[in-house]
């Protein structure tokens, strides 16, 4: 930052306040939950007011808490919400394949196909349909590898209602009640064993 302004100072203070308010939160992994990888993927559509690009969000749970998550701006402008969700599902599939390979290396046994939950049925149908048609011709070729992995059975996309879409927390600001609900579903809990003074 060669020319920091007051806006940057306000943003930095906001981050510090956030960190201070979340110091007591931890991921709660419980013994005996098993090794089942389940993912959630979501996207807003044209959420950035400057360039109209969408944000992809994805999280993968391993047992009782999330093991991997990301939120990133998409590289191109999506022409529809289905397109934005499809790009997010493609990124989630990459993450699922990588996680499965890593877990195979750790545990030495292959996992069942990863289930990735999406709240857009058109997107799910697009991942299952190997035929290119007018509705999908504008989607970049790099996102279509997802169809190959779905056909091989490496990943499976299933519908989940928007009210249960955990990845929603990674793509947009939510009302407090929804934010707390999704945070709890991700296995993020307040650590009751340590006080702030002990950290």
Placement of each model-derived feature along the sequence:
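RNase H-like nuclease fold core
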Residues: 40-82
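Flexible loop/turn segments at secondary-structure boundaries
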Residues: 1-3, 35-37, 45-49, 68, ...
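RNase H-like nuclease module associated with reverse transcription
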Residues: 36, 72-199
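Structured nucleic-acid-interacting core domains from mobile-element enzymes and related host factors
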Residues: 17-41, 108-110
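Secondary-structure capping and boundary motifs in well-ordered enzyme cores
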Residues: 4-8, 32-33, 52, 80-85
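Conserved helix-loop functional segments at active or binding sites
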Residues: 21-25, 46, 66-68, 102-105
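Active-site-proximal structural scaffolding
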Residues: 8, 20, 53, 92-95, ...
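C-terminal reverse transcriptase regions that engage the nucleic-acid substrate
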Residues: 1-26, 161, 169-171
């Amino acid at each position: 930052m060669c020319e920091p302004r007051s806006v940057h100072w306000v943003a930095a203070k906001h981050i510090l306040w956030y960190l201070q308010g979340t110091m007591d939160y931890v991921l709660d992994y419980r013994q005996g939950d098993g090794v089942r990888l389940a993912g959630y993927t979501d996207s807003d559509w044209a959420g950035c007011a400057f360039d109209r690009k969408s944000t992809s969000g994805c999280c993968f749970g391993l047992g009782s808490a999330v093991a991997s998550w990301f939120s990133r701006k998409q590289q191109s402008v999506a022409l529809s919400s289905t397109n934005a969700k499809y790009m997010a599902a493609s990124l989630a599939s990459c993450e699922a394949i990588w996680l499965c390979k890593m877990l195979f290396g750790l545990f030495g046994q292959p996992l069942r196909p990863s289930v990735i939950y999406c709240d857009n049925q058109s997107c799910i149908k697009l991942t299952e349909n190997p035929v290119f048609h007018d509705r999908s011709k504008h989607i970049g070729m790099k996102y279509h590898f997802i169809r190959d992995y779905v056909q091989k059975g490496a990943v499976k996309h299933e519908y989940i209602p928007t009210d249960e879409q955990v990845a929603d927390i990674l793509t947009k600001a939510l009302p407090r009640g929804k934010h707390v609900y999704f945070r709890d579903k991700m296995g993020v809990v307040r650590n009751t064993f340590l006080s702030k003074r002990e950290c």
